[in-house]
């Protein structure tokens, strides 16, 4: 049983690597956030299923900003510290729509496979 749980935990990590961009885009589609706010929002919208570590989050935010999917500006966080705030760009909105459609197709296919007799 423990081995199956460890395997499931490893699978969750692999799934997160494949979905991190989509989760970041979705979190920011709900409003501007600083980096740690993005991590908190992802945890909220996935009901605690995904907890993004800073070592994964910040390189992804940087890469997505370089790709033109996000824009950013410096501001002050709720605890009065300087923080970089991220917003979804038009290109990011298009990317989110494409990734959402892709994951809906995958979800339907997996649900269909699991329901097969």
Describe each PLM feature range:
Residues 12-58:
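N-terminal helix-turn-helix DNA-binding core of bacterial DNA-binding proteins
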Residues 58-60, 65:
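Conserved RNAP core-binding helix
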């Amino acid at each position: 049983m423990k081995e199956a749980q460890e395997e499931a935990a490893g699978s969750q990590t692999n799934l997160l690597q494949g979905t991190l961009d989509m989760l970041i885009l979705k979190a920011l589609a709900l409003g501007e956030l600083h980096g740690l706010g993005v991590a908190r929002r992802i945890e909220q919208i996935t009901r605690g299923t995904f907890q993004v570590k800073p070592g994964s989050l910040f390189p992804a935010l940087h890469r997505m900003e370089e790709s033109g999917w996000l824009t950013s500006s410096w501001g002050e966080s709720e605890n009065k510290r300087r923080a970089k705030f991220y917003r979804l760009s038009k290109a990011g909105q298009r990317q989110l729509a494409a990734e959402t459609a892709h994951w809906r197709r995958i979800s339907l296919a997996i649900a269909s496979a699991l329901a097969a007799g």
